[in-house]
């Protein structure tokens, strides 16, 4: 069934760059956070379609927005900083957007926040999970750093400045060097005692980071400019060890005394999308990847680089994947040309029938098809076409172009507690599942799916 529009969130005067679900634990409901390329952030009540708070989080475009705790929101901007905001005390927020071309934010109250300086020389996002933050490296945009920012021991502190304990646990990790190390280890396992030339060493590594996604506290994937997708395993040793003395007392010693630093290892690498830069990554049981090309790939997790990659590939017939969202029964892809398409996942029993029926979503040779085109949608840019000039001569009418869909986000409604009767009624009217699409004209539209 084609998505049905349920509402629009208007106010941003610039292209939307991020849309994420923010779980409001105070009211026990899901809300939405949007950002734009002028640094403005809006926190939305879905039932009323009105902002709970609006503020300018950065002086430049926002690249990443992530909820990292019950009341903390992380934003990452092109102004070379990551900021962490305590946003649940929203009663004092401004709830109005600035006028068009107005960037002064003095009248908009800022939430309490702390700041972390990071490298933003490229357009890669940052990624957070369980107290760890991955960012492009300070020294080299081709490499990456990993920070520990919220240790478990500080969880009881009342304010974010007290809880923040910034520690860089991995510095300037070089994927090319790690790949050579992994290949050498594999060669030794196979009994090969000489170095095999690496095609990646003939060029400037893998290029800059494009996308990064955490899968678990010990596993993450990075997509590169070269088109490679690399899976990294992170092993972090416990910071303290307990030693029992002869008298029976126990003392704790810092593990740094025995040089137990976190270790990184490459356990997966795919050159499937080369030479097209990776533009979208999404993990849902498997890793879904899109690039500047026309192909969607699905990668199965593996535990060693020695294993043969299991990749399913699909010809989307449209070049340039902007974003990907995946549900158990549906995959949604946004393209650079403004089209958003949905693909239903099919059971294996229906594969032969699907190959006969599918004309718009074919697979590459030797792959297994699991999808069927379900719907596609787009928004036209409003235009006034001139059919005749003043001298009466007919002129060619310009075809309308599409509004680019920048972001995709799946939002599931949840019950509101400790709220007014009016809010409870409004919450019942919200669809159980919404697809939110952030567009380049600053509008975020919600579709029932």
Swiss-Prot record:
InterPro entries, sorted: WD40/YVTN_repeat-like_dom_sf, WD40_repeat_dom_sf, WD40_rpt
Subcellular locations according to the entry: Nucleus
Gene Ontology annotations for the cellular component aspect, listed alphabetically: nucleus
Record has Nucleus as a keyword: yes
Naturally occurring in which organism (per UniProt): Meyerozyma guilliermondii (strain ATCC 6260 / CBS 566 / DSM 6381 / JCM 1539 / NBRC 10279 / NRRL Y-324) (Yeast)
GO BP, sorted A to Z: chromatin organization
Record bears the keyword Endoplasmic reticulum: no
Name of the protein: ASTRA-associated protein 1
Quaternary context: Component of the ASTRA chromatin remodeling machinery complex.
SUPFAM superfamilies: WD40 repeat-like
WD repeats: 11-54, 57-95, 113-157, 224-263, 273-309, 313-350, 420-449
The entry's keywords: Chromatin regulator, Nucleus, Repeat, WD repeat
Family named by the database record: Belongs to the WD repeat ASA1 family.
Function as written in the Swiss-Prot or TrEMBL entry: Component of the ASTRA complex involved in chromatin remodeling.
